[in-house]
Amino acid sequence: METMLFSPYTIRGVTIKNRIVMSPMCMYSCDTEDGKVRNWHKIHYPTRAVGQVGLIIVEATAVAAQGRISSRDLGIWSDEHVDGLRELASLVKEHGAKIGIQLAHAGRKSEVDGEIIAPSAIPFSEKTRTPKEMTKADIEETIQAFQNGARRAKEAGFDIIEIHGAHGYLINEFLSPLSNRRQDEYGGSPENRYRFLGEIIDAVREVWDGPLFVRISASDYHPEGLTVKDYVPYAKRMKEQGVDLIDVSSGAVVPAKIRVYPGYQVPFAETIRREANIATGAVGLITSGLQAEEILRNGRADLVFLARELLRNPYWPYAAAKELGTTISASVQYERGWRF
């Protein structure tokens, strides 16, 4: 049986062998707290490549030490990180997958020691620290950090870069009126709140000509926050700037109760794809091959991003192929167990 899920997808000359993407998920495994790749990463990611995932996106990787979510996050703020990342990328590609990396800055949600920064001096919650409002110099320095991170990702041999603009981290904090109360050109109007992300995209594009994704939170789940309709013009602008795909998640810019169910974020990806005319990735409680195939067949997204399901089962593509009545190849070492 021919399937969409196991059909190839090409972006800017990079061909992903199927539409299955391992979503970036923090592993909090840098036990040396220096941001460097550890043995855990060198086992965790290649295992999913052996399992026939088409694209693996490495977890949120901090472009600045102060921009880590935790002290155990991966980093790309120094040239010293490149060798470990290069080895990781090579291991994944050795097993037939493409590899991406998510460039991130946690902003006010950083839990590292010392000063934290954000567009405005507003804490995430009553239980978290109040960040310092970023100066123009802070903004320029952070944009440069994203560009430097992209340059290092290129040196390390990554196929795809994703900019993390979701989940209440720094870029998302600029986009949302709930966290951005600035009175200058980086706050106020939707255009001004987009400016920080727009300048990051331009800076990354100066050093990176490969596929570029941006992850967004398409709903703030708050009456005064952003909705998917607000993100349509943002997505159009991203496309004009050379972004190739929007990875559509939601929430986490402020504390909120979110009603989750299988595929609960898929309608957001569908709306962005249809109304902004840009490729999208759907993510959020996608757990079966039939569910993934439906999303693709009905034009709701171009790629499916799996997170927790790939933690539970690194060989999910095999199970999905069996469910859909098709066959996929296995690594030679595993062929005895993968016969359909």
UniProtKB/Swiss-Prot annotation:
Q: Which GO terms describe its molecular function?
A: FMN binding; NADP binding; NADPH dehydrogenase activity
Recorded catalytic activity of this chain's protein: A + NADPH + H(+) = AH2 + NADP(+)
Q: Which cofactor does it need?
A: FMN
Superkingdom, taxonomy of origin: Bacteria
Is Flavoprotein one of the keywords? yes
Q: Which residues bind substrate?
A: Y28, H164, G165, A166, H167
**Binding annotation for FMN:** S23, P24, M25, C26, A60, Q102, R215, A307, R308
Q: Which UniProt keywords apply?
A: Detoxification, Flavoprotein, FMN, NADP, Oxidoreductase
Instruction: Identify the InterPro entries for this entry.
Output: Aldolase_TIM (IPR013785), NADPH_DH_bac (IPR023663), OxRdtase_FMN_N (IPR001155), YqjM-like (IPR044152)
This enzyme's EC code(s): 1.6.99.1
Report the record's Gene Ontology biological process terms: response to toxic substance
The protein's job, in short, is: Catalyzes the reduction of the double bond of an array of alpha,beta-unsaturated aldehydes and ketones. It also reduces the nitro group of nitroester and nitroaromatic compounds. It could have a role in detoxification processes.
Q: How does it assemble?
A: Homotetramer.
Tell me its family: Belongs to the NADH:flavin oxidoreductase/NADH oxidase family. NamA subfamily.
**What NCBIfam families does this protein's entry cite?**
PRK13523.1
> Under what name is this protein listed?
NADPH dehydrogenase
